[in-house]
Amino acid sequence: MKKLILHFSTLLLLPLGTAHAQQHVDLPRADGAITPSIVYEPKAVKGCAPLALLSHGAGGSEERGLRYLGEALARDGWRAIALGHRESGLPVLRKDMRAEGFHDGIAALVTDADAYKARFMDIDAALKWSEAQCHAPYKVLAGHSMGAITVMLEAGARNKLGLTTHGAFDAYVALSPEGPGIVFPTDAWQPIKAPMLLITGTKDKGLDGDWTWRSQAFDGLGSGACRWLAVLDGATHMNFGGLDLADHYKTRTTSLVTQYLDGLRSGHCPSLSAAPGLVLRSK
């Protein structure tokens, strides 16, 4: 039996009808489990495309949520892989919520060290698969909510779960990042060395606070490595997760991400531009 199973489909990704290939890929993990994934391939690129891995939030899947970001990155010339984290997907979240209620159920999942260890194996499986296709010249990890926690952990943030990683990416993008609380101590972000873009919204509420609490992750980062914080007026938690993403927020979020990453790929820290309804900070 083949260890790697590919299911190919074609999806209309652009409003004007331009088609991009989409692969459903089952990636073999180091522990023998399978990581279901969706690969968004760029239409045309010279050589090997840069790589972006996408990590969903608690209760998400490879098919729900961050599709909008995968599509945008593919249009921008990236190979984007949306990972399906089974150990922190919807069935697991429902089980925790039935046992402990809504708030405590989510808290139980986002503080489960084993769930993050499984996510790290998902990430390693995707990196191994992508490397077998070609050597990506630039690698980025992006995530939303629990996926943003995963991003911070992979980048080297201190944490209360006893987790360590090897920081295999050139840059990171955190949508709805977590501030200090049940996962991160107040000095969590100081060890992070890589460039990072953080995006939140004024209605982006979390377990331990609102957008100002989320912004503390940016405050905790050191300066000098192209760190940006973007705050979108009126944007909610679900907007960034893609489950309730109005075109207005979709356009702004994907534009920020692609502009930031394109600048880094070209060898400089981009100068993002503030606009009505968008507040930016950098260091």
Where are these regions (language model features)?
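Glycine-rich His-Gly loop
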Residues: 54-59, 145, 201-202
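Serine-hydrolase catalytic machinery in alpha/beta-hydrolase-like enzymes
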Residues: 27-134
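Alpha/beta-hydrolase active-site loop signature
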Residues: 59, 85-89, 179, 204, ...
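Primarily recognizes the serine-hydrolase "nucleophile elbow" in alpha/beta-hydrolase
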Residues: 126-191
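Alpha/beta-hydrolase-fold serine-hydrolase catalytic core, especially in secreted/extracellular enzymes
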Residues: 234-235, 241-283
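Bacterial N-terminal signal peptides
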Residues: 7-15
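Sec/Tat signal peptide C-region and signal peptidase I cleavage site
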Residues: 17-21
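The feature captures the conserved acid-bearing segment of alpha/beta-hydrolase catalytic domains
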Residues: 164-234
